[in-house]
Curated annotation (Swiss-Prot):
Entry protein name: Protein phosphatase EYA3
Species this chain originates from: Gallus gallus (Chicken)
Gene: EYA3
Family according to the record: Belongs to the HAD-like hydrolase superfamily. EYA family.
Gene3D superfamilies listed in its UniProt record: 3.40.50.12350
Enzyme Commission number(s) from the entry: 3.1.3.48
Signal peptide as annotated in the record: none
Any GO BP: response to ionizing radiation
Length: 119
């Protein structure tokens, strides 16, 4: 029961801040995060901006969703998604952690949920 409550609370926080992670941070941390994102964009030739555009395009298509599978534990993975500003393109129910169950199980769950005929 405690685990279910914990995940409900995590979901509430994720959904509340998925488009504004800065709301979780102090003004100084928010500014530092923005500087860090800017530096990352410069160093990676706008990787994050390009990735976000691609993910938004996929999300805008009929019958298309973005799914993230990670080997990071779920809560830290959710934090990273928010910090990178990708919460709006990855609904929490489409983020899978393979840490405890493995990638194969994640793919089985996705196939069970969406079917085999996917692109």
């Amino acid at each position: 029961r405690k685990l279910a409550f914990r995940y409900r609370r995590v979901r509430e926080i994720y959904d509340k801040y998925k488009t504004n992670v800065g709301g979780l941070l102090s003004p100084q941390k928010r500014e530092a995060l923005q500087r860090l994102r800017t530096d990352i964009e410069v160093l990676t030739d706008s990787w994050l901006e390009t990735a976000l555009k691609s993910l938004l395009l996929i999300q805008s298509r009929k019958n298309c969703v973005n799914i993230l599978i990670t080997t990071t534990q779920l809560v830290p993975a959710l934090a990273k998604v928010l910090l990178y500003g990708l919460g709006e393109v990855f609904p929490i129910e489409n983020i899978y952690s393979a840490t405890k169950i493995g990638k194969e199980s994640c793919f089985e769950r996705i196939v069970s949920r969406f079917g085999k005929k996917v692109t």
